Amino acid sequence: MKRLPLILLSLTTLATMVFCLLRQGARRDHSDLVTLARSGAAETCTRFSDNQSHGDDGDDWGGVAAFRTFQQACALLPEQGSDAVCSAVYGQLLHPDGAKAHLPEIIAVMELLAQDPTDASARLRLYELRDLLQEDA
């Protein structure tokens, strides 16, 4: 009976330590996902900017691939919710003829997302981009 409080205290301490370790790992994973989303958005900007300057189709498809990286990272971020908007934009980017007419808008939105992929106003601009791309589809 006298050992029961000591055992409970030890188990509580152990559980607290495990919780803290798991929480640190989750924070690190979140930071890694944000970094991946940022780099995907930045690479999308670079590729589409190069395509706009030089007209190389390889840059166009590289931009689509970079957007896919951004999309997958955002899908794993808890604050992003559904990735339906990213899927819709990605689907429109797969048809480069329609997307080429809106390269300046795509670049502008992705520059915002490259700064902070969790920013609500940048996310709103992504919704507007989706609507713009779907109008021309």
Where are these regions (language model features)?
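N-terminal cationic amphipathic segment used for targeting or macromolecule association
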Residues: 13, 35, 118-120
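Enrichment for repetitive, rod-forming helical segments
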Residues: 9-10, 45, 130-132
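Sequence-pattern detector for short linear motifs
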Residues: 5-6, 26, 41
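Hydrophobic membrane-insertion alpha-helices, especially the h-region
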Residues: 3-22
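C-terminal amphipathic alpha-helix
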Residues: 98-137
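Alpha-helical segments in soluble extracytoplasmic regions
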Residues: 36-95, 124-128
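Transmembrane signal-anchor/signal-peptide helices with a preference for the extracytoplasmic
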Residues: 16-35
